[in-house]
Amino acid sequence: MRLAHGGVKVTVLERQATPGGKMRSLPSAAGMIDAGPTVLTMKPVFEALFREVGCQLADYATLIQEDILARHFWRDGTRLDLMRDPQASLENVRHSFGTAAADEFCKFSRDAQRLFDTLNEPMMQSATPALRRMIPEMLKSPSTVMTMDPLRSLAQSLGRRFSEPRLAQLFARYATYVGGLPQASPALLALIWHVESLGVWHVKGGMSQLAYGMEACAKNLGAEFRYDSYVTGFERGKSGKYQLECNDRFLSCDAVLFNGDPNALARGFLGPAAS
């Protein structure tokens, strides 16, 4: 969207038949259901993207804010709703797990906000996070380093924070956001709780509608989308242009942006030149 808005001739090659990648819908007996992400957080990031290209998110997708951020069940019958209203979340924790757990949850929430405030710009909003950009933010509040709990995994850190194991289990799920295990993921992922507490939205028609909205906006700006396009390799020619092998044909371009798993490049899945 940004490139097309800037006057660049953009062609998107997508292996699947529809936009969105993992953000897709599949048919079921109850109708279409999300098969990837089911809700959206950090709505301002998407609003800012559309504004940058002279558009409005609301014109391309309908987002509806949820009062219940997440509902949790345990086999013993315990249920916990984390809410859009922070005080309601605190009261729900107190009701389900007691006063001590509520106090621990309150401190955890404060620490998650501190981590978010420190690392949002240099890490979460950066396409290429770098330690040199994080250090100045950390120096503004040196105690944040201890809050990061850098020597412990997410599971270890949560085990120390919560005397109630079910709360530790609940927040350990953030490891799945990066495809990791709680025992092997950094404690820093605790900041995701603050991201969720800022608001959770669902997209009318399913999350895939956001992808379709972004596609429509990009098309209006001049971008071209080619689906069922399987790129198997690319290399840079003597002229400086890149040659992409796609569906047994070669396409020429000035630059390549790869939006897949970086490990695929490192392992040579798109040819030795790409790795």
Give the predicted meaning of each segment.
Residues 6-8, 221, 251:
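Helix C-cap/helix->beta junction micro-motif
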Residues 75-184:
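Rossmann-like flavin
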Residues 1-120:
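N-terminal glycine-rich phosphate/pyrophosphate-binding loop and immediately adjacent elements
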Residues 19-21, 177-180, 233-235, 264-267:
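Flexible loop/turn segments at secondary-structure boundaries
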Residues 245-255, 259-260:
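Core beta-strand elements of the Rossmann-like FAD/NAD(P) dinucleotide-binding domain
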Residues 258-275:
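Flavin (primarily FAD) binding-site architecture
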Residues 190-247:
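Helical element adjacent to the flavin cofactor pocket in flavoenzyme catalytic cores
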Residues 62, 168-174, 215, 227-233, ...:
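Beta-strand segments within the central parallel beta-sheet cores of soluble alpha/beta enzyme folds
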